Amino acid sequence: MILMNKILKYLFLMISKVFSFAIFSVIFLLLFLQFETLNLQSLNPIIKTNYVEKHLKRTDFDINYINLKFDKNSNELIFTIDSAFKNKINASEWMLFIRSELKINVLLNILEKKIFTFTVSSIEKKEDEAISDFNFYGSLNSLKNTNMIEIKGSAKDLPLIFVKDLWPENLGKGARAWTNRSLFEGIISNLEFDSEFVLKKNGELLYEPVINLDFNFNDINTYYLKGMPPMTDTLGTGHLDFNKFRINLIDGRINLDDGTRIYINNGKFNAFDIKQRHGPGQILIDASSNVGDFFNLLSKHDYISKLVKLNRDNLFGESKLKLQFDFPLKNSVKFSETKTNINLEVGELKIYNKNKNVSIIGDSALLILDYDINEARFFKGSIKTKSIKILELPVFAQILDVSIPGLSNISDGGRDITFGTSNFDVELSNQGINIFDGILKPESNLPVVGNSLGLSISGKYFFDEKLIDFNGTVVPVSWLNNLPSNVPILGELFSGSKDGEGLIGIKFRIYSENGDEVKIETNPLSVLTPGFLQRIFD
């Protein structure tokens, strides 16, 4: 409502100036009745001082022609102004030559409803930078108990800098600041405007005004988060009404410094209540790229880079990313003020080790993370995979070597071990990653099919200290392990309280202290021990 009041105040200020100008002109007309038309070019300095220099500080403005005419047939005073607007800093960026015409009915009768009408239209010029399609018109109508203002218009091929330059400083300060800070270059290819204000005779709004502004845009560079590379080559639509503002991004891309690209398939910006100070805002991004490029992008952000420690060269797989940011609409927004959701889906994932050899292959992986400062100062979420095949992972091989000799040959080119599915609940902060109840289930419950193996793991990895501390259970021969679980009452005693525990299970610990090498320990008392006794020896 505050923004709307400013708009109306600005509108009424302009109307009052028009009427003041009209009264002055009528007096001028009465003094010189012998003329049918008057040249008012001498008013040019007054108009520039009282309007242009106050409200359009980034624009050069010149009046080429001012004329006043009284039409006896229609009883109208007709003001005609030919003027030129140019970008003050760089006139080659845009020019607008317009003809404005204001018709004031000076002899209203009971049948006459229109108090005044106006039109603003572009004049075609040879200059390449000149805007050639700009047309607005409106009227003030007197009804029985109310007055109604109607304003309509359309425009094509407006440079974004034109919108910035002609945006009054005191009108919609927050939106204006965000536009100046976040949007650059590009074209408003098509714009349609329609509005209606119904006022009481005392000038107060009778009810909520109707405002609809629809536009198409292309090639606008958009900075969505501080420090991140912008979206470019954009194509989309926008809508503004009395309550909300939204932008739909149809296409775009993010160019990374190594020459790779992230393709934006769909995006949205929503300001759900523009009347509310610091009202709710939302950004949605739907993108596709190589998973390594996504991590490369996230590493550009000052805060997120502290959480994302994976090198893009370690990851490969075509992926789809969905990002959601909810935040207050104000001039400066801290990351801690946002609610963030990350949904990353990867197909045919490959993870490489430091020797550039394929270490892990997966049919698919899904990462879901949420960040809410009101709940905690870290990301919470889960990682899910399907058909993960471990080819070469030294730490895992050492666990198997200590626990189950004969299965550890995955570290030297032997048979791989495949897990059918996995699920990890995780917390991610700038200190490290915490895994809760990580479960890797076997591909087959038949021990004769491949290396059938289950595993559970929990623990934490500290980024800066490079310290790890994980505990887990290796459960071989899942088919045999699951037999007791089918026995009523006794099933839980023998199979354990968690997925991944069973009649036969080997407890292990992976840890490091003071930056030393990683150590692996197993609990020999947990081997061939029922699940409820395994928990005793933890």
Q: What function would you assign to each model-found segment?
A:
Residues I151-G153, F215, L249, I285-A287, ...:
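Membrane-embedded beta-strand positions of outer-membrane beta-barrel proteins
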Residues I2-F35, K200-N202, L298-D302, L310, ...:
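Extended terminal
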Residues E204-E208, L213-T222, K320-K334, T340-I342, ...:
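Long hydrophobic segments that form regular secondary structure
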Residues I47, K57-N64, S92-N105, I123-G138, ...:
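Amphipathic hydrophobic-ligand
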Residues A84-F85, E112-F116, W167-A177, D214-I220, ...:
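Flexible, solvent-exposed coil segments and beta strand-coil junctions
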Residues I2-K9, T49, E53-K54, D60, ...:
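Secondary-structure transition motifs
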Residues L30-I115:
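Terminal hydrophobic membrane-targeting helix
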Residues I81-K88, S121-I123, D194-V198, N216-Y223, ...:
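Generic short beta-strand segments
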